Amino acid sequence: MITQRQNDILNLIVELFTQTHEPVGSKALQRTIDSSSATIRNDMAKLEKLGLLEKAHTSSGRMPSPAGFKYFVEHSLRLDSIDEQDIYHVIKAFDFEAFKLEDMLQKASHILSEMTGYTSVILDVEPARQRLTGFDVVQLSNHDALAVMTLDESKPVTVQFAIPRNFLTRDLIAFKAIVEERLLDGSVMDIHYKLRTEIPQIVQKYFVTTDNVLQLFDYVFSELFLETVFVAGKVNSLTYSDLSTYQFLDNEQQVAISLRQSLKEGEMASVQVADSQEAALADVSVLTHKFLIPYRGFGLLSLIGPIDMDYRRSVSLVNIIGKVLAAKLGDYYRYLNSNHYEVH
């Protein structure tokens, strides 16, 4: 455990270093720390011995080590902090008209990436927690059709498929009827379970040959089990990490799994400093924050960047963007649920 003065010195070194990326000497600290230069140097030496500070090769100053950044995050960083100076810029960046949910989530991801210079990832509500609230089949021709699904009464998902060769029109009607009777209004988690248990038995009552029918069920509903992921600033990862992080960001489903695992049960926010179980994120910092998607649940807003990032500003931007995004989504869903009259 370090003393209060040593804690203040570490915090100030972190703050100054993240702003200038230059080693910090005792003279710079004296402007804020009410102690002699010798006392400050002695405390800096103790912090270095504890592994919280590192010597710079080209200067007599010190800079935070990865362990020092981690100590700062765990003991001094407020995860709910907001810098009022950033509020106006974020609100201004959100001044655009969105025509669908994906537009807002993608825009929010770009805003966070552009304002930090790092990599931003936004996830929609976890698939397992969404509900199938609408289903229809539209026959496009004699050989193909379109499954139109609605999640949470607002999110459309469409899947085009080739009609099995032995299918007649009445078979498509039966397919739709099974979905409406057994799967509609259920959660995606329930659907995944029923496709392996109930549906194979039900299909036998309606169809003579069941193999291609079960394959059709799997094909149509497989889309529901995938995370909706919006990545921005992927190229930025090359400035603070190696190629493995850049390549990892291409695997959006694995990215989603790793980011969800960074939050413990019941947590609304977390900061990992070189502490991810994912090898591609082991040498970077990951800020993760839940934000409200009204009427549906929680999305996830994440920022991936260097260990020596400006944590206070990054946390502030994540919090502000999460709040502004939730407000925009609230307006969007209220509009969808309201009576809409066409004006001539």
UniProtKB/Swiss-Prot annotation:
Cross-referenced SUPFAM superfamilies: GAF domain-like, Winged helix' DNA-binding domain
GO biological process, one term: negative regulation of DNA-templated transcription
Keywords associated with the record: Repressor, Stress response, Transcription, Transcription regulation
An MF annotation (GO) of this entry: DNA binding
Family under the similarity heading: Belongs to the HrcA family.
Known role: Negative regulator of class I heat shock genes (grpE-dnaK-dnaJ and groELS operons). Prevents heat-shock induction of these operons.
Name of the protein described by the UniProt record: Heat-inducible transcription repressor HrcA
The species this protein was found in: Streptococcus agalactiae serotype V (strain ATCC BAA-611 / 2603 V/R)
